[in-house]
Amino acid sequence: MQSEMHPELAKLSFLLGRWEGLGVAGYPDTEEFQFTQVIEFTHDGHPHLNYRSQVWRVNEDGSRGEPVTSESGYWRVRTGKAAQQEDPDQPPIHVEVLISHPEGYSEVYLGTVFAHRVELHTDVVVRTETGLPAAASHRLYGLFGDNRETLGYAWDLAANSKELQPYMSAQLQRVDRKS
């Protein structure tokens, strides 16, 4: 039985479902490559979205190749006074996102939601002793297209002593509206 969506999630409801598509990734000292990706946003009745992403290289024949990475986490909405920042010149913080990576690091993002667009900046990045030395990230997610059925995203990453720069971007089609 499907849980009823928590009312605080209305602002993020446009993300719900399963998204699939193609993207491109590249970083200094790494050859650029195409990938296929699946992202799922689900809910379980609690005041957060469950998030899961899986990425595979694209083979020369266009088929799905070897796994590249995955990540999972939770998207939480801030409401009322909790969304307001101490500095009135700063935009409110609408969402907190926690994402963990098998490369041995986790990120806590703070972000804003406007219409069908989410912009996230890392607040904290922690890693294991042997984890990828990630220092900061910026992500942008948004719907576009005639029926707003395409989820575009861009991920900038600062890692391996490099400054924040483009890392991955993709255009994904909604293939399942299940929430």
From Swiss-Prot:
**Database matches in InterPro entries:** Calycin, Nb(III)_bact/plant, Nitrobindin, THAP4-like_heme-bd
* Protein name in UniProt: Ferric nitrobindin-like protein
Please indicate the residue ranges that the annotation assigns to the motif GXWXGXG.
17-23
Which species is the source of this protein? Thermobifida fusca (strain YX)
Which family is annotated? Belongs to the nitrobindin family.
State the superkingdom. Bacteria
